[in-house]
């Protein structure tokens, strides 16, 4: 991550419409670069092409305000941090272009970068990351079952914590 980004400050909320939308709504003074917002549940999570992102309880719904030197590389940067984190846990993840992170052929999560410009100048960039952490197949809508997975389903670890997962992701993003 570029040295233009300070260490991250994580704020956790129980529920919100969308973590990306919230960071984009806030004045920059209230959400400077390095601000991170984690929701334990989202009511209007979005993915690529404005598709609805299932935000079932037990997922990590995280957005981070950044000041990147190259906003076009944010999706790859966010996915790479998640892949590195999975590797540190002994899990083999892959990137399904352009923004999905997969394990064993099933979608674990995704990244959604949003850049806002004022004229030709980058005003702000938000990186949204959604990861299925605690969900079982029964927690997902019937049409997604068999196509998605979660950390708890893919790991021999018996204990997972969404906030700790977000903190570890932010550390991976810093490196």
Model regions and ranges:
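N-terminal lobe of the biotin/lipoate ligase/transferase fold
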Residues: 1-88, 160
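Long, positively charged amphipathic alpha-helical accessory segments at protein N-termini or as interdomain linkers
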Residues: 2-6, 69-93, 103-175
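Conserved active-site carboxylates
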Residues: 100
């Amino acid at each position: 991550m570029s040295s233009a980004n300070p260490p991250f400050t994580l704020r956790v909320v129980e529920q919100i419409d969308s973590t990306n939308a919230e960071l984009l709504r806030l004045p920059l003074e209230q959400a400077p670069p390095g601000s991170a917002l984690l929701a334990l549940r989202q009511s209007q999570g979005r993915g690529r092409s404005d598709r609805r992102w299932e935000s079932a309880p037990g997922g990590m719904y995280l957005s981070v305000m950044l000041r990147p030197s190259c906003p076009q590389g944010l999706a790859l940067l966010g996915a790479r941090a998640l892949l590195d984190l999975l590797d540190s846990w002994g899990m083999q993840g892959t990137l399904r272009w352009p923004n999905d992170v997969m394990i064993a052929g099933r979608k674990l999560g995704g990244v959604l970068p949003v850049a806002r410009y004022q004229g030709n100048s980058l005003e702000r960039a938000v990186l949204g990351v959604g990861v299925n952490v605690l969900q079982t197949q029964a927690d997902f809508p019937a049409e997604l079952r068999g196509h998605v997975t979660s950390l708890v389903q893919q790991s021999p670890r018996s204990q997972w914590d969404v906030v700790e997962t977000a903190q570890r992701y932010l550390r991976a993003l810093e490196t």
